[in-house]
Amino acid sequence: MAPGLWGPSPPVVLLLLSLLGLAAAGKLLVTSVDGSPWFSIREGLDMLRQKGHEVVVVVPEVSLNIKTSENFVIKRYPVPFTQEDMDNAVKTLFRIIFEGGSFLERYFKGMENMKIVSDFIVSSCEQLLQNKELIRYLEESKFDAILTDPVIPCGVILAEHLSLPSVYFLRGIPCGLDFEASQCPNPPSYVPRSFSDLTDQMTFFQRVKNLLFDTQNLFLCDFAFEPYSKLASEFLQREVTVQDLLRNGSVWLLRMEFVLDYPRPLMPNMIPIGGANCAHKELPQEFEAVVNASGEHGIVVFSLGSMVSEIPMKKAMEIAEALGTVPQTVFWRYTGKAPPNLPKNVKLVKWLPQNDLLAHPKTRAFITHGGSHGVYEGICNAVPMVLMPLFGDQMDNAKRVESRGAGLTLNILEMTSSDISNALKAVINDKKYKENIQRLSDLHLDRPIHPLDLAVHWVEFVMRHKGAPHLRPAAHDLNWVQYHSLDVIAFLAAVTLLSLFISFKCCLCCCRRFCCKKGRTGKATKAKSH
């Protein structure tokens, strides 16, 4: 009997299956994701593209790390500043970090330069919202969802305008606005605030300090997000704040995981995906050859992140001197001028496959600035760390690694060559650091689904179901008084006081009656006796 009588041939089945996959594919808009977060999410976007989804990335002509890609569509829009302007501002910011002088002097210089960078970012957002041609394209493209980093809330404003369900991809908002907007409990008694340099085990005065940071964070949020609230109100043509818009997020993909971060409450739509960037590939041949030639001593990986292009020569020479005191071969990612005392065991490279090197069994230590991207790579690959935090959440990340016994933290301004050498030798030679980071790595990897797959799943989930309203807590519909049950407490207190008052009055009345009756009885008895 002819095969065609029983059903379609295999090629036809494959064609039908491929068409079914295309029918299920969605369209994702990505915006306001640059810098280190871009490196963390890029692999997830590649995976979404491989699954048949169309990915459109909206990015300004001037960006930090986003380049062209074959896997997704890049839509660029003009901005009123150049790449050189942005690069110079970032370089100046990091130069100030390394400069000497008093704390206040460095603080005000840093704030002044940070404002320049911030103005560039706000201006970029304004140009996007005012680009009528691009906005029209986005309106007509019928996206299923938007993926954005809410730290730069331009994507959040776009999501509201386009009526799109949003997936937030972030490490955290420094002033705690993420937890406030999501109605997530954030008790200061055991949840350390950003930049507080505290752990979850706090003394009384540390808890006082932690609570005071909440007051500081209120001003920080107002200062940082007021320009975006103004932009949003003008663009959406109604009075609105960034916090109002953030409340509409469908899913929060948090670049955190409780192996590193301290246990704390999360809402049902908050998904920890720390370590999503840990998949590694084979080393390029030129790196593999150097690693194999390192012998029994192995290698050390050193990188202060993609944004630090150079450091002052004096500091670079101190670092070079320290690196020469260990027998390991050191890969140092550095694009500045090579220090004249660079030892033979140090290989300066403009780029290195960081995660692939950390995954190599010959890697003995990782010197890092403490960015969450690199820290999770260190944990995934069980490499003890020497941390030199520069700014932002890096101080908090370093504190967490050190409190777990998986590394040592150095003050990059005050550290000497001897400090660097001693810290590096300690994490290499003292077995406790390797044992502790190995334990963290085992805990982190012992999970039913890889963080990257989990992140991709939730993006697809939001695209398929047009959001996740079933995960939205009713707390969003309550005011402050209702949320804290102050009205209920007041009602119960009033009922209790009223009951006590009535009981008191009843007792008083009974006592008076009893006393009066007793008085009359006494008088009657006296009258009879006479």
Regions found by a protein language model. Give the residues of each.
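Extracellular structured ligand-interaction cores
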Residues: 163-165, 249, 267
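Donor nucleotide-sugar binding/catalytic pocket of nucleotide-sugar-dependent glycosyltransferases
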Residues: 251-255, 268-278
